[in-house]
Amino acid sequence: MDIHRIHVLRQRGGDVDGLPREVVVKDRESKMRKYLCWLDGPWRGKLAMAARPRGGDWLRDDMASWKRAGIDTVLSLLTPDEERDLDLRDEAGEAKAQGMGFGSFPVPDRQVPRSEAEWAEVLEKVTRALSEGKNVVVHCRQGIGRSGLVAACLLVRRGMSPGAAVELVSAERGVSVPETSEQRDWIDQYAVALASTK
């Protein structure tokens, strides 16, 4: 079924290939929930990893779907160039319009954060939100490399070894994460830095 046609028919309130609009929307909602990879951790809230929401006309729908799926806070790892290219410059506003918190910590695709101190601060904020019982979704472009980096480091922060954290996140995501050896090394380095502060 043509995606553009679905969008136009939904705007007009009509049926899509003989299916009532409500059925199509409900099916889309179930698929959106599948795109959220939930990770249970040692927190009251839940962490989800995801690919970036669709931009442009679809952004509001995807933000609303995340809210209905139980997301309280969105953390984007996209760079400003990616936000522009993917038509996601309004993501913060749309998230807030849905009653969700929004944070941005740009990390270039397939790379690692530029600042260890800023990285630690972001992880502290996410940990605090999760500990308060909030559900947080972290996304990059495909929800693998940079998102996996955040998820693994959050688990390391709570006492898991880097290897076990990577294994768990990879198993839950259904694909090997993170994407690069540099990202994997960053998790090890983060664990060493964390241990030195205790």
Could you tell me what each predicted segment is?
Residues 146:
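Conserved SAM/SAH-binding loop-helix junction
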